[in-house]
């Protein structure tokens, strides 16, 4: 599976238009490539795979799922898994920017420029929960103990 396939899936999920305006294509691809490595390093993600290799030279992901269904279903699962992970990484980067943490000193009290930090944190937490549920459901449904009916 190519990185481009994963990036395309991410683009369909990303709703923040500033991401596409903020970075050139090369900058965005470099950033997303780093995020892919971060996602693979997450223990509950890594545990889904028997083998997984990110080849940055040819921009390709090679993998074998532990609970494989068939090639097409596995590809859909992996694309969605990494696209969701990229969305989380992107949101984390937005939350950690200096603008969202900035305060303005005015008159007698501090005021925040935009007080949506807490809402963004809650949204990020929801995305992470959905991410874990997505993995959990895949592993549970395709686990050998349930068997086929």
State the predicted function of each range:
Residues 1-74, 137-149:
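Conserved short "hinge" loops at termini or chain/domain junctions
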Residues 75-95:
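Elongated alpha-helical scaffolds
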Residues 10-13, 75, 91, 120, ...:
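Generic hydrophobic, helix-prone segments enriched in Leu/Val/Ile
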